[in-house]
Structure formats: structure tokens, C-alpha cells
């Protein structure tokens, strides 16, 4: 009897090792694939809505998701950043001729919403791609919300995928959990945000000690590069995260004027050179990698697919070359993410985005199409393919 118990325990142990061996880990300050025993270059797009496509009962939505992943794989993307537990609440409009608007509700733990993530993770696994899963959209410092966050984490991370039989906390197709997807706080609230992230990390670690944990961080232009790098280092150390995702949105953060998105690029590049160099120095010594998430608007703030994106393409080319340079020099910047992928989404025949479920990288309460990279944006797609394949 004891012998059979020993064999059973051994098999369970081996199974756990198998799951652990497929995880992406930190090794000497680098993202490391324990299966291939090699470093990982982080080449990502934000596609928050991917689980919604997978959960839809409309077969065309699932077909779109499959085709989007095929396109991303062809471009060279290996990570898709998504949002967990999401539901769209439709908001009626006063004008009956208009389609309903929508808002995003998060921390939804009903079983039906696991269906989409189950499907997505299975499709990513088929393509040797990974998911980075945000557990909420934005940071919310309300204590009641924090309690709900903890309940959601417990339920979500212990869910068993109906297609693969693997519990999420053991699933190697998940590269990391991200505390939240967006950062909407001012500099004065940074200490509160740091405490909140620390609490969230502790909550996640109690359930899952295998996956990496990420959190977003936004540079404060009011500080010089060295001061902001020290702030990033302190934030990483105090929260216990494995990797920071630095959000760079030049127009929204005041790096360039909205009236000079092309003319302002040279000055933007000089500023980012200084910040990235400072980040590399500080983060390398702490043996913690970081990535950058970038977004840039279309020329003249167009919102339709295939409209001119020359400024954005120049910015993406700069960022791609900067990431390649840092990786070759074994610096702390390990990769980048594009916010985000709109893929096959299209407005109506008048060029108006009137359908909430025609998902783009923008949330329903944001200007649809402004930052999205669509399949029809051939020149932008070519730039991304060149930069991603270069690595």
C-alpha cells in the first residue's frame, strides 16, 4: 500500500514539474523559457477583447479570433495581452436611430466568461504563443473593490480549462498575470498605487507562486530621467513584481503636442533615449527586466482603417530598433507591446464606428480606431513585421 502511495505522489510531483518546466521565469534579470532553455524576446500586442471573441456564441467571432491569431503569428508577435473577466454592459442612447453604446465591466467571475479564455489559451498553445492576462482594467483603490479583486483572483486562477484540463495557475500558455491594464493616477497618488499593487501581488501569490506578475508604470514627464528611473526601481522593489510595463503614450502624456505629431518626433526620440538609458542602468542593477507599451495616433487623428499613419510608423520603427539594440547589449529592456491590435474590425459604410461588438484595441468609452493597428494598415503591419522578425 505504501508503495502505491509513493508512486502516486511521484506521478503528481512529475506532473507539477512538467507544468513548471513550461513556465517563463526570471533568470539573471532576463525572461527565460524553461522548455527551450533560452531567453525570451517579448513581442506583444494588446488585444483586451480576445476572450470576448472566444466566448461569443456567434461562430464568426471565434473565426475572427482564430484568423487574428494567425495574422499576429505571421507578423512575429509571440505575446497577446488580454483582459480577464470582462463583460460589456450596453448603454441605451436617446436617439433611437443610433446603436447602443457600451461600457466595460470587469471582475466578472461567472462560468460563461471562462469559455472565451479557455478557447483563447488553447489557440495560443497551438501556436507556441503566450498570454499576459490583466486581472482588472484600471487601478481602483477602494477597499470594497480590493476585496472583490481578491475573490475574483481566487476564482479565476483556480479555474480548470474545460478544453485542456489545466488549471490556470498551472498553465504555461500564460506568461504572466498583470495586476491591471491601465494606470490612471497622478504623481501624487503614486504611493497609494504602489501600496495597492503590493497588496494585489500578495493576493495573487497566495494562489499562484509559479507565474510572473507584472504591473503598469507610467513615466512622469515632470521628473528628469534619473529621478524617474529611481522611482521605477523603488516601485518594482516595494511591490514585488517581476516585470514592469512602462506605458508610453506621447500625446496623452505631453511628450508631443497633438498639433505636431510628426514634427515633434525628433524631440520625442531624444527624450525617450534619455529615459530608456536611465531605466536600463537602474533596472539592470536590480536584475529586474521591464518592457514598454507604446501607442501613437494616426495622422490627423483619423480613426478609419487604411488611413495615413506615417508618424506612427516612424515612432514604431524607432521603438523597435531601440528594443533590438537593448536586447543585443543585454540591457534591462526586454521587449515591447503595441497598443493595440484592431485587426479585421471595420466601421460601417459611412466610416462610423456604430457597433460596440466590432472590437478594436480601444475600450468602448475611448475613441475607436485612433490607436488601433488594423490588418488593412499594410504599411504599419510591414513595419511591425520587419522589427519583430529582426529579433
Predicted regions and their residues:
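Boundary at the C-terminal end of the N-terminal hydrophobic targeting segment
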Residues: 17-22
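Active-site mouth of glycoside hydrolases
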Residues: 25-255, 262-281, 285-288, 300-388
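Short acidic/histidine-rich active-site segments
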Residues: 291-297
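Sec-dependent N-terminal signal peptides
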Residues: 4-14
Amino acid at each position: 500500500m505504501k508503495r502505491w502511495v509513493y508512486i502516486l505522489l511521484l506521478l503528481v510531483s512529475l506532473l507539477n514539474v512538467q507544468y513548471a518546466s513550461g513556465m517563463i521565469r526570471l533568470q539573471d534579470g532576463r525572461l527565460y523559457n524553461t522548455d527551450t532553455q533560452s531567453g525570451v524576446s517579448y513581442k506583444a500586442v494588446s488585444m483586451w477583447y480576445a476572450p470576448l471573441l472566444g466566448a461569443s456564441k456567434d461562430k464568426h467571432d471565434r473565426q475572427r479570433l482564430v484568423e487574428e491569431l494567425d495574422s499576429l503569428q505571421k507578423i512575429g508577435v509571440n505575446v497577446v495581452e488580454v483582459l480577464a473577466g470582462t463583460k460589456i454592459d450596453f448603454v441605451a442612447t436617446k436617439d433611437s436611430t443610433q446603436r447602443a453604446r457600451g461600457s466595460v465591466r470587469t471582475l466578472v467571475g461567472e462560468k460563461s466568461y471562462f469559455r472565451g479564455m479557455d478557447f483563447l489559451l488553447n489557440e495560443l498553445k497551438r501556436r507556441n504563443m503566450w498570454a499576459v492576462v490583466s486581472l482588472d482594467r484600471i487601478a481602483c483603490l477602494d477597499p470594497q473593490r480590493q476585496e472583490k479583486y481578491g475573490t475574483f483572483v481566487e476564482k479565476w486562477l483556480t479555474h480548470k480549462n474545460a478544453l485542456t484540463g489545466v488549471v490556470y495557475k498551472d498553465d504555461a500558455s500564460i506568461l504572466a498575470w498583470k495586476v491591471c491594464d491601465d494606470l490612471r493616477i497622478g504623481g501624487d497618488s503614486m504611493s497609494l498605487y504602489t501600496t495597492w499593487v503590493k497588496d494585489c501581488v500578495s493576493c495573487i501569490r497566495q494562489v499562484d507562486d509559479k507565474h510572473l506578475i507584472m504591473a503598469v508604470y507610467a513615466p512622469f514627464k515632470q521628473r528628469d530621467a534619473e529621478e524617474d528611473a529611481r522611482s521605477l526601481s523603488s516601485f518594482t522593489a516595494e511591490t514585488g513584481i517581476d516585470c514592469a510595463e512602462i506605458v508610453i503614450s506621447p500625446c496623452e502624456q505631453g511628450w508631443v503636442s497633438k498639433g505636431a505629431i510628426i514634427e515633434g518626433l525628433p524631440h520625442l526620440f531624444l527624450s525617450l533615449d534619455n529615459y530608456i538609458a536611465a531605466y536600463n542602468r537602474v533596472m539592470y542593477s536590480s536584475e529586474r527586466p521591464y518592457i514598454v507599451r507604446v501607442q501613437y495616433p494616426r495622422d490627423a487623428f483619423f480613426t478609419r482603417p487604411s488611413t495615413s499613419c506615417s508618424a506612427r510608423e516612424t515612432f514604431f520603427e524607432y521603438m523597435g530598433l531601440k528594443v533590438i539594440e537593448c536586447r543585443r547589449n543585454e540591457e534591462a529592456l526586454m521587449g515591447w507591446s503595441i497598443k493595440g491590435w484592431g485587426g479585421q474590425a471595420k466601421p460601417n459604410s459611412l466610416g462610423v464606428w456604430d457597433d460596440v461588438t466590432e472590437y478594436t484595441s480601444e475600450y468602448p468609452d475611448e475613441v475607436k480606431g485612433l490607436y488601433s493597428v488594423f490588418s488593412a494598415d499594410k504599411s504599419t503591419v510591414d513595419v511591425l513585421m520587419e522589427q519583430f522578425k529582426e529579433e
